[in-house]
Amino acid sequence: MKKKLNLCPKGTYDFFGQGAKIFIDVRKVFFNQAKKFNFSYIETPIFEYANIFLTTNQIADIVSKELYKFFDKSGRELALRPEGTAPIMRSVAQHKLFQTEKKFFYFGPMFRYENPQKGRFRQFYQAGFEIINYKKDSLEFQILEIILLIKSIFKDLGINEYELKINFLSNLTTRNIYEKNLAQYFEKFSDKLEPISKIRIKKNPLRILDDKIEQEKEFVKLAPKINTFWTMEDKNIFNRITSILEEFKISYKVDYNLVRGLDYYDDFVFEFIDTSQTLGTKLALVGGGCYNNLPTKFGLNNFKSIGMAFGIERLIEILKSKKNIKEQNLDFFLLSFTDKEILLNFKLAKILRKENFLVDLNKTPFSVSKGFQLAKKSGAKFVFFFEKNQAKNYISLKNLQTGKNEQILYTEINFEYLNSIIKASENA
């Protein structure tokens, strides 16, 4: 059966119209916030050598089931990146960017072969922030900066319905002891587990806690909790973290079943969950945590790191549902009825655009009635046009909302006045 040429692949989408506008606005917020918090932008390839992901997330679903792998013409095994942290760590090791603490920010597409549904796609965008090679005794302050950054981004986006969940997974030694106990516990209930979870008992029992179906089962809710395995040092660290969150009046909920979908997370982990019901279910808008073991895969020892990533499509879905989204309409449409007027309006457009006004114009002469129809369809607030018997060096300016018409000196445009009428029309 032939595939239709006019369909995009399953799990992908096209950005246009309101979605494209929101995407651009969201991206702008992230770049502005990254600058405010002094994060440097980093861009890694969309595809990497597959072993970067295979060795850092051996039993994670995104590698075992969802990784887009392929061989190039030279027989090298490559993969489309499913997440952004491992490629950044590869870049840090390759370019020796580890002499001092570094703060990186990225924004780009990721790829996972998963079942598409609301808020989940096979090609999707993530915005991520990573703080690498920080001093061990500064953990709670690194966490505070990450959380404050997230809240600042949400504020800029106008998103205020969310819940912060936190957990502490301890170090590798404690976590291994916990996982053995967890596996023994789930063995008793193996007949009640989903097929994939039966495999996870031996490979990665923590993922059973994170499974949406398993989470609803009573015996999973009653499974051993990580905090009962904490050392005294773990308890002290966790208390310092919660104390500083409370100091800054940051609401949080401790969820001892919270784990992350990537294997390399340890110590502190967190998620901000959407509570608006826009996405239909309580999906994570952003999640992250510490990944002190990941750098060792790249030959970087004693290398403390923390990071997080936002799901951009989920943010866009929430913003689409809000009633107060303003379209970015044109400021001026320059209407021409003759070829000579088109040339004059191109010169005017150049001047107006230089002053940062949003401008468009017709490049084919129109009749008066069709021309004004076009101007209204453009969404412009005002239209410039030349009238018959127009006074020399003047052009007419019409307010398309009120119908008010006035004469403007073409040779000496008063930009202050134009700015004032644009602002007045926006507040009307």
Curated annotation (Swiss-Prot):
Q: State whether keyword Lyase applies.
A: no
Q: Name the InterPro entries on file.
A: aa-tRNA-synth_II, aa-tRNA-synth_II/BPL/LPL, Anticodon-bd_dom_sf, His-tRNA-ligase, HisRS-like_core, HisRS/HisZ
Q: Enzyme group, top EC level?
A: ligase
Location(s), subcellular: Cytoplasm
Recorded GO MF terms: ATP binding; histidine-tRNA ligase activity
Q: Which residues form the signal peptide?
A: none
Q: Which UniProt keywords apply?
A: Aminoacyl-tRNA synthetase, ATP-binding, Cytoplasm, Ligase, Nucleotide-binding, Protein biosynthesis
Give the EC number(s) listed in the UniProt record. Answer: 6.1.1.21
Superkingdom to which the source organism belongs? Bacteria
Q: Which reaction does it catalyse?
A: tRNA(His) + L-histidine + ATP = L-histidyl-tRNA(His) + AMP + diphosphate + H(+)
Q: Name one GO biological process term.
A: histidyl-tRNA aminoacylation
Q: Which Gene3D superfamilies match?
A: Anticodon-binding domain, Bira Bifunctional Protein, Domain 2
- One Pfam family assigned to this protein is tRNA-synt_His
> Chief subcellular site?
cytoplasm
- Describe its partners and assembly state: Homodimer.
UniProt xrefs under NCBIfam families: hisS (TIGR00442)
**Name of this chain's protein:** Histidine--tRNA ligase
| Organism of origin | Mesomycoplasma hyopneumoniae (strain J / ATCC 25934 / NCTC 10110) (Mycoplasma hyopneumoniae)
